């Protein structure tokens, strides 16, 4: 929205599916859920294909001419696509502040009762792909917690030596 200087209020299916207000089966905002929050559908972004034209930007005048914005995708979803996991059964793992294991399940959603989330991977030219994803929200950020909050390490680099000194047969709790 800001990149287009308030001209386009749009999102893609991958981001919409993460709001908890999107029906992944109907591929639209869920009327029942949004009404629970007192939200009108008109207040929500238009949902577009990931490769749709979202508008134009000149980056607040840094470019002489505005350029088109054509690629919008959630971060983990973009990582899945960027790592070439474009076919059903292909999986990627991302480790950072949080961690994500995501599997492309193809053109039909699969719902699990095992704690993984069903969402849209992307929609390219009208064709959607679904994913199953397991998240750990605070994995890489735990290093900062060990250092700054608990004072157990002086730097992130220390964790390498600690890991090397650990006995794989020992039980570790964190």
Which residues make up each language-model segment?
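A generic structural-conservation signal
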Residues: 42-43, 156
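Gly/charged, well-structured mid-domain segments that form the phosphate/adenylate-handling core
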Residues: 46-53
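Active-site core segments that coordinate phosphate-bearing ligands/cofactors
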Residues: 1-10, 15-16, 20-31, 35-36, ...
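Short helix-boundary/re-entrant hairpin motifs in multi-pass inner-membrane proteins
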Residues: 38, 44-45
């Amino acid at each position: 929205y800001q990149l287009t200087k308030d001209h386009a209020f749009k999102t893609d299916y991958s981001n919409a599916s993460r709001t908890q207000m999107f029906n992944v089966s109907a591929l639209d905002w869920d009327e029942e859920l949004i009404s629970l929050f007192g939200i009108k559908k008109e207040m929500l972004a238009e949902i577009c294909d990931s490769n749709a034209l979202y508008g134009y930007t000149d980056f607040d005048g840094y470019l002489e001419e505005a350029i088109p914005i054509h690629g919008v995708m959630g971060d983990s979803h973009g990582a899945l696509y960027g790592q070439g996991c474009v076919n059903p059964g292909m999986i990627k793992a991302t480790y950072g502040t949080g961690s994500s294991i995501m599997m492309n399940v193809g053109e039909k959603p699969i719902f699990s009762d095992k704690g993984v989330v069903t969402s849209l991977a992307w929609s390219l030219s009208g064709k959607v792909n679904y994913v199953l994803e397991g998240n750990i929200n605070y994995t890489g950020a735990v290093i900062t917690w060990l250092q700054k909050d608990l004072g157990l390490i002086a730097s992130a680099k220390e964790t390498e030596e600690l890991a090397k000194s650990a006995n794989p047969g020992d039980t570790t709790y964190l």
